[in-house]
């Protein structure tokens, strides 16, 4: 399984291209986010306005939109045309491509978001890679740590792969989507255009262009009072 099967690094993130090989497993990219950021020139970004707390190395493209309140703990890199909404919290080793929306109260850490990613309403994105055009509904959690804190494995049709990672949230291929209040357990992998419906708790692999959903039945009974 190669990263090239899930996404292609967009033009907006070409300064990082040498650090993210399309030939390796996509979760291997998580190990190089910090290294890739250390190699960048953080000059030339827009001035951080009052109300936005910034610490460490932070680059925000001049065309990106900053809110009146946000917290950016570097290293953080925000690409052109991206919109950050009030209360978002980017805390270390975060790369965001062009024309994304990072929602109010969104929390991101050690993650790479490519172009046109939409995470507009209270998501948690930890140790994850989101491909071009990926979308998370309100309240989605990309959980990145097992309860027993053991290394995380990926369950694929070909077998179980030990990633060696203690923290690993999810891989979302290009245009993959996750519905409101769904939880992806550590090591979840979604192929391009895969879709997880609202409130699902998911582990493992969802093939490309496949819908993962749970069938439920709602029963109606008369009140007795």
Map each language-model feature to its residues:
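Short Cys/His-rich Zn2+-coordinating modules
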Residues: 45-46, 64, 82, 115-116
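Glycine-rich active-site/cofactor-binding loop and its immediate structural neighborhood
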Residues: 60-105
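Terminal amphipathic alpha-helical/low-complexity segments used for targeting or macromolecular assembly
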Residues: 1-56, 193, 199, 208-210, ...
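Conserved short histidine dyad/triad with adjacent acidic residue
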Residues: 42-44, 60-62, 173
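Residue-level "contact hotspot" at macromolecular interaction interfaces
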Residues: 57-59, 77, 95, 129, ...
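Glycine-rich hexapeptide-repeat left-handed beta-helix
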Residues: 18, 113, 119-225
């Amino acid at each position: 399984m190669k990263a090239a099967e899930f996404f292609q690094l967009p033009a907006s993130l070409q300064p990082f291209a040498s650090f993210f090989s399309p030939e390796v497993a996509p979760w291997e990219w998580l190990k190089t986010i910090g290294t890739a950021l250390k190699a960048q020139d953080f000059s030339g970004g827009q001035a951080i306005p009052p109300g936005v707390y910034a610490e460490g190395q932070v680059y925000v493209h001049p065309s990106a939109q900053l809110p009146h309140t946000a917290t950016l703990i570097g290293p953080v890199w925000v690409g052109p045309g991206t919109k950050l909404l009030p209360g978002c919290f980017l805390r270390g080793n975060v790369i965001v491509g062009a024309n994304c929306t990072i929602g109010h109260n969104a929390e991101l850490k050690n993650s790479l978001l490519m172009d046109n990613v939409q995470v507009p309403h209270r998501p948690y994105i930890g140790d994850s890679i989101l491909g071009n055009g990926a979308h998370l509904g309100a309240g989605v959690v990309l959980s990145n740590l097992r309860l027993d804190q053991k290394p995380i494995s990926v369950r694929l049709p070909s077998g179980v792969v030990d990633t060696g990672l203690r923290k690993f949230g999810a891989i979302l291929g290009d245009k993959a989507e996750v519905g409101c209040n769904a939880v992806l357990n550590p090591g979840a992998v979604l192929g391009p255009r895969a879709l997880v419906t609202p409130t699902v708790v998911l582990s493992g692999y969802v093939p490309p262009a496949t819908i993962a959903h749970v069938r439920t039945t709602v029963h109606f009974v008369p009140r007795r009072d």
